[in-house]
Amino acid sequence: VIRVSLTVLGVVLAACATTASMPEPPEGRAIYMENCVQCHGPAGKGDGPWAAAMAPAPSDLTQLGVNGDFPRARILSVIDGYDRTGLPGKEMPEFGALLKGETVPLDVGDGVLTPTPRPLAALLAYLESIQEP
């Protein structure tokens, strides 16, 4: 009886536990439209309203996944500021809000699930969804 009760209790607790769902591209698109569109443009082509005044021009974000290889770790490091080239004009603005809040387990290509701020993971999902051949 005790074993059955513990099993039932375990099932009930498992059903009650909430797990963070992985962000989908539409969630990331909203973040993109709020933070990235001025430089990278509405379609991610690097042609936003501020792009003409920038040197070098913003990257075409639809071409990040060359040959079907989407470099998740590299893209995250550029967005969050770890990948600074030191070259003038290559800096991304600071996106402090993208680095806060709930985290989700994200595999950036090395097979390791890394706790990643949900907004950052959502933006990554959106960028991956707009890749062109």
PLM segments and residue spans:
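Detector for the c-type heme attachment site
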Residues: T19, C39-G46, A97, E128
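An acidic site on a long C-lobe helix of protein kinase domains
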Residues: E24, P71, P115-P119
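Electrostatic cytochrome c docking/interface patches
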Residues: A15-I31
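Extracytoplasmic electron-transfer domains, predominantly the class I c-type cytochrome c fold
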Residues: A53-V112, L123
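Sec-dependent bacterial lipoprotein signal peptides
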Residues: V1-C16
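The canonical Cys-X-X-Cys-His
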Residues: G28, Y32-P42, M92, L123, ...
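C-terminal partner/receptor-binding element of secreted or periplasmic proteins
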Residues: R118-P133
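Sec-exported extracytoplasmic/periplasmic mature domains
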Residues: M33, V37, D80-R84, E128-E132
